[in-house]
Amino acid sequence: MQKQKIRIRLKAFDYKLIDQSALEIVDTAKRTGAIVKGPVPLPTRMQRFDILRSPHVNKSSRDQFEIRTHQRLMDIVDPTDKTVDALMKLDLPAGVDVEIKLQ
């Protein structure tokens, strides 16, 4: 039988929140007997915006804003049924986006 793998990708604006969530997922998977590879930090995506301060003149006066999207990747190799059930019941914070792929 072919080995199954679960790939989990986390995205969040706050790096503390994403690290905490990754740690919870790793602990849950290890408790149920699965092998975990990761979390691997992926490159942080930065979006920068320049906005004029004044509504009419003073083009040289601008505000700069930045949004950073942090990402983590982890693989769960050869998961058991217990692992899948435990991951489904796991309650993660609202600011973390989770993508799960079965391979």
Swiss-Prot record:
GO terms for biological process: translation. GO terms for cellular component: ribonucleoprotein complex; ribosome. Gene3D superfamilies: Ribosomal protein S10 domain. It holds the Pfam family Ribosomal_S10. GO terms for molecular function: structural constituent of ribosome; tRNA binding. It comes from the Bacteria. Keywords: Ribonucleoprotein, Ribosomal protein. Part of the 30S ribosomal subunit. Involved in the binding of tRNA to the ribosomes. NCBIfam families: PRK00596.1 (NF001861), rpsJ_bact (TIGR01049). Belongs to the universal ribosomal protein uS10 family. This is Small ribosomal subunit protein uS10.
